[in-house]
Curated annotation (Swiss-Prot):
Pfam families: Cep57_CLD, Cep57_MT_bd. Residues 243-252 have a biased composition (Basic residues). Its main location: cytoplasm. This is Centrosomal protein cep57l1. It comes from Xenopus tropicalis (Western clawed frog). The gene is cep57l1. Interacts with clip1, mis12, ndc80 and zwint. Interacts with gamma-tubulin. One of its GO terms (molecular function) is microtubule binding.
Amino acid sequence: MESLSKESYLSSFHQFPSYAPLPDHIKFESVSSKKIQCSALENISPHQYDILQAPNSRALISALKTLQEKICRLELEKTHARDRLTNLTRVAGEHKKVLESEKQSAELAAKEATNQQNDIGKQLNNAKQRCSLLEKQLDYMKEMMENADTQKTTIHEHQMLTQKEQKEIQSKLKKLEVLEKMCTRLSATHKSAETKIQHLEEKLSVEEQNRKALQDKAAQVQTSLEVNRILLSSASAQNSTQRKVKKKKQSKLKNSVSKEPPSKCFYPKAGELPFVAGKSTTSSHSLSANVQNVLHMMKHHSPQVSQKNPKTAEHKPSVLPGGSRTIPTRLISSFTGDNLSDILLALQDELGQMSFEHQELLRHINETKNTDMREDLERELDYVVKQMEIKSDQIMKLKRHQLNVNKLKKTAKLLKEQPRPTSVTKLAADKQNTGAKDPSTPRRKGDLADGSGTPNSKASLELLKSVRKIQMTLKKDDIMWEK
């Protein structure tokens, strides 16, 4: 049993442990160490070991040798491990240094990356700010462009308006030039008309002077003839009685009145006179010339007027206390008052027509939309208003004149209601007074010695008196007509 254990033990020593092959320098070192150990074993003296004397000394020696070899190997391995540890530590230190350097480089790279990121962020912020500024500038530029476009459009519209206004002004200037030319023409025609009117008035004044001279001569001739007739009648009346003389005078008066009724000669209607105020639509001339013309025709018994009025009523003449007949004052009042009433009615009719035209013009102005037509209508309206004012002034003046005429009528009636003198001396005194009051009237009966005269002469005297009163009360500026 002991032998088996020894063999197993020795066999365990004979069996070498498994290990990895060593490198060349380690093999070299192990061989050298083996040689050293073997030499050390060989140097051991045999007397130092009792094992050599044992029966299994060879096995023991071999086992010891193997142990020594194993120990050597272990030592070699230990040294190799130490060397490896040192190498590993050195490599680990180098690796550590490399890692530290890499770590430092990574930290530096990270720092640089963070710095770069910060720089990039700052640059981005700056870029954003610049972009916002650029956007604001773009918006401002857009607004500027829009404002410029609007200004261009407004300037263009203003230019168009100015051009239109200039065209309108030019058209108005042309119209003004045309109107100025028309005004110059009208002024020239007005001046020529005024000169013609002046010439006509001068001619009328000359004709009046001639007519007055002829009337004076005719009055003188008539007075001389009447004186001769009265003398002849007085000479023939000495043989006859006074009753026969009165009958003859009455028959003569009746014959004269029946042959020539005074109403037909002196008092035609206002519509049949050669000129009546208020009926003419054209430009009229002065009133004094018209009145003189009418008076001339009435005094001279114009057949033109008497033929146009055949249907006038025959008025019964009033009988004076001396036996002579006169033309009634109602006919004179018809000439003075009725004609004025007709003129007033005509003027009022014209004023009504003008008011109707005024309303029509206002309606047309409200309905029209054209500016030129409206301006023309407004001018016509102003002209109509002026004409209406003129007509109203004319109506007021005529009313005042009518009041004056009515006052004169009343005074004439009061004078005629008084008893008239029958003696020849009183009649002569009255005639002299009338001649002194109105020197322009011809003194037809002033030279009469007798108080007896024809009824036609007395009627003409009274008519002349009344007409002269009207002519003295009328003035040129009392009545104004259209021009």
